[in-house]
Amino acid sequence: MGKIRQGFIKRVARELFNKYPNEFTRDFEHNKKKVEELTNVTSKKIRNRIAGYITKLVRMKEEGKIL
């Protein structure tokens, strides 16, 4: 079974994804830098989890699984 992300990580990721839809791509490294620019998250672990979830959201949007 996979790991379950915490609710606040999903919430922050969705807020960033909806507020800045053209800033994020399928590239995790690019998204990681953008999350660092757009938020005040100080923890590297939290930043990476948010960037990973945003990467997943971008991929799902491109595949038509979310609107």
Curated annotation (Swiss-Prot):
Keywords from the named record: Ribonucleoprotein, Ribosomal protein
InterPro entries per UniProt: Ribosomal_eS17 (IPR001210), Ribosomal_eS17_CS (IPR018273), Ribosomal_eS17_sf (IPR036401)
Domain of life where this protein originates: Archaea
TM region(s), chain numbering: none
An example Gene Ontology molecular-function term: structural constituent of ribosome
Record's keyword annotation contains Zinc-finger: no
Single GO biological process annotation from the record: translation
Pfam families named among the record's database cross-references: Ribosomal_S17e (PF00833)
PROSITE patterns: RIBOSOMAL_S17E
GO cellular component, one term: ribosome
Record-linked SUPFAM superfamilies: Rps17e-like (SSF116820)
Similarity comment: family membership: Belongs to the eukaryotic ribosomal protein eS17 family.
Protein's UniProt name: Small ribosomal subunit protein eS17
Gene source species: Pyrococcus abyssi (strain GE5 / Orsay)
Gene this protein is translated from: rps17e
